[in-house]
Amino acid sequence: MPCTTVLAGKLATNDRSTMIARTDDGHFDEKKLIVVEPDQQPKIYKSVESHVEITLPENPMRYTSCPSVDPKHGIWAATGINAANVGMTATETTTSNPRVLAADPMVELREAKDGEEERCGGIGEEDIVVLVLPYIRSAREGVLRLGALLEQYGTYESNGIAFSDENEVWWLETVGGHHWIAKKIPEDRVIINPNQFGMDSFDLEDAFGARESHLCSADLREFISENHLDLNQDGKFNPRDIFGSHRDMDHIYNTPRAWFMGRCLAPHTYRWDGENADFTPESDDIPWSYVPERKVAAEDIQYLLSSHYQGTPYDPYAGHAEKGGIYRPIGINRTGVTTICQIRSDVPDAIKGIEWVCFGSTTFSAWLPVYTNVPQMPDYLSNVTLDAETDNLYWVSRFVGALADKCYGSCIQNVWGYQDTVNIRGRQIVLKYDRLMRESGDFTLAAQANDELCAMAKEESTQILNKVLRTASEQMKNGFSFADTCVNK
């Protein structure tokens, strides 16, 4: 998927939680948030896209999932948190280069033709969450399981995948059809990744030694050497230069997003604007990781992932005729779902996992926190139809975005108020139920909390829909200033 990812280590956040977040920017895919119980997990998985068939381990865990409502192209689970409080988001579609893809080709489906049997493809975004998340008890285990699957079955696309637990965040990027490289995020860092191979440093000695913070395919050194992939002149190992891309397209689609996020996280650490800027929107060497100048909260990640270059000449809503809209924004119209998987360290195990869910274009939608260790999600999040309606948060968010976009200046203050109110009321409900569950020891109250959260979200989303619909109606092009009473006088 053409997505944007933000990862935060526990010392970079305001509450020592880990957070992994990603916009799932498909083709206006209808999405929902559900809980998958162990008896609902398949024993043999078959991909719709690649036809690969994989026998799954016994004893899967419960996990949350954001699958496509229409199953005709597969599950596309996107993201979730399992019962062991391990989070995962998959995938960030990334880039590669011809040298890598020639040396280790993608494993693509080859249909039966001219008497030849069908050859299955590898695994991809459609499959990865279902294949990995129910079976892992730490972020590191997620990397190792996915790495083994990539080596055995291969993949047909370049992807980045994030894993998190209470203490660690890991980022894995695929390299060609079967290779991979993964890094533990330093605890005090925030990572940004916009549809490009992002990792810009890697310790090969650690990966082939202690394996404390770096993991990779067993033959990665030989793969690089035998295929002359290392283009670096300074002796440093930079995976982005070796495995990634520096295309003209990156400079309008990918690097500008990194530039905007970097200037938010480290506005004074680097110079982002002017003739003497360290980095411009089209720089290929924008840093991948940052020690943020102040600790980040969930709302800061929300801001990054809903941005449209506000405060810059590239904002499509600001009326800059020359530059507005020339770069791909992060908050984009086709987003299906965005989540922040937050694993907290200051609450009991049963309620460590919080998933912040946002449907539709993040610029206009609200983020709702929900507890993940529950038997099912409320209908307002899980009962999403293919036909537009107003009984679920997905479609209401779509309506609000489509209406407010056309009259941005008139609607955006109401939208900001809606987003802030849902954040405030959502946090209040979580704080209340955290306290109740700690005091009572009854962690089944998490389901009741989610019901209350969704009732609040429905109330607030109905109000904002009423407001933007009224504003958009008043600004229709067929409006006329005379009323019937004026004509008849």
What is the role of each PLM region?
Residues 135-141:
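Short, charged, surface-exposed loops that flank catalytic or proteolytic processing sites
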Residues 2-125, 145-278, 285:
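A contiguous strand-loop segment
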Residues 310, 314-441:
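Substrate-recognition/cap regions that form aromatic- and gly/pro-loop-enriched pockets
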Residues 140, 153-154, 331:
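Short, well-structured beta-strand/strand-turn elements
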Residues 254-324, 328-333, 418-423, 427-434:
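Accessory, solvent-exposed terminal regions and/or long lumenal/extracellular loops of proteins
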